[in-house]
C-alpha cells in the first residue's frame, strides 16, 4: 500500500507535461526526475519528527519506490545521492510487492484512461472494437446484459478488462515464483516475477499503442499539454 500511494508523489502538476517542463527548465542542473524527487520528499522534505528528517520509512519501501520499474542502470545525480544515504541495491530487481505495485499502476491507468477518453469524446465504441480482444469482451458484455444502457455496458467492459488483467497477473505470477523461497531470491532472480503472461503482455502492448495513437497524441490533448508546459515553465522562471 505504501508503494502504491508513494510511487508517484514526486509528480509535478499536470503530470508528464509538467515533468517535461521541469526537465527542460533544470537541464543545466541535471534535469528533473519525479521518482528521485518523490524519494527526496519522503526522506528529507517531509519532516514531522524532531530528531530526524523524512517519514522514517522502511528500507524495503524506499527500495521499492526507487526501482519499482526494475533495476536502475543509470541513476541520475538525485537518485545517486539518495542511494548513498540509503544503499538501495539499484542493480537488482525489487521486491515482489514493488513489482506488483508497478503492474497494478499499469492496469489502473490503462483502464482509467479508456474511461477518460470515452467521457471526453476522444474515443467511442467503434474505436475500442477495432481491437480484437476488446471486441470479444464487448460481445460477451452485450450477451450477458443485452438490455443495459450503453454507458453501463461500456463501464462493464472496462471492469471486465480489469478483472481479466488481474486474474492473468495472479495466475502467471504464481507460476513464476515457484521455487523462489526468499526475498533475496526474488532480487537475485534476474527477471520480473510479478508479470503478465506473454499473451496478456501482447494485449497490453497493442492497447498502449492504440491509446497513444488515439488519445495521448490527440490534438486537443496535445494542446492541453502545451499549455501545461507553458504554465510550469513560467512559474519556474518567476520563482527560480
Question: What would you call each of these model-derived segments?
Answer:
Residues 32-36, 41-240:
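Histidine-centered, transition-metal-coordinating active-site segments
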Amino acid at each position: 500500500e505504501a508503494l502504491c500511494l508513494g510511487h508517484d508523489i514526486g509528480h509535478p502538476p499536470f503530470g508528464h507535461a509538467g515533468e517535461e517542463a521541469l526537465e527542460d527548465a533544470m537541464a543545466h542542473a541535471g534535469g528533473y526526475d519525479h521518482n528521485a524527487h518523490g524519494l527526496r520528499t519522503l526522506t528529507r522534505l517531509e519532516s514531522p519528527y524532531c530528531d530526524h528528517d523524512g517519514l522514517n520509512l522502511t528500507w524495503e519501501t524506499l527500495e521499492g519506490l526507487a526501482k519499482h520499474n526494475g533495476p536502475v542502470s543509470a541513476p541520475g545525480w538525485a537518485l545517486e545521492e539518495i542511494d548513498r544515504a540509503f544503499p538501495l541495491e539499484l542493480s537488482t530487481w525489487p521486491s515482489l510487492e514493488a513489482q506488483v505495485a508497478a503492474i497494478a499502476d499499469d492496469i489502473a491507468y490503462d483502464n482509467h484512461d479508456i474511461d477518460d477518453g470515452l467521457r471526453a469524446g476522444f474515443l467511442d465504441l467503434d474505436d475500442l472494437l477495432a481491437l480484437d480482444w476488446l471486441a470479444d469482451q464487448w460481445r460477451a458484455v452485450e450477451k450477458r446484459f443485452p438490455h443495459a444502457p450503453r454507458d453501463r455496458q461500456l463501464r462493464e467492459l472496462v471492469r471486465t478488462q480489469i478483472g481479466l488483467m488481474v486474474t492473468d497477473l495472479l495466475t502467471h505470477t504464481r507460476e513464476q515464483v515457484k521455487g523462489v523461497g526468499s526475498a533475496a531470491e526474488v532480487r537475485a532472480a534476474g527477471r520480473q516475477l510479478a508479470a503478465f503472461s506473454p499473451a496478456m503482455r501482447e494485449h497490453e502492448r497493442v492497447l498502449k499503442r492504440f491509446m497513444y495513437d488515439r488519445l495521448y497524441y490527440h490534438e486537443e490533448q496535445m494542446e492541453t499539454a502545451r499549455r501545461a508546459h507553458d504554465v510550469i515553465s513560467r512559474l519556474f522562471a518567476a520563482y527560480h
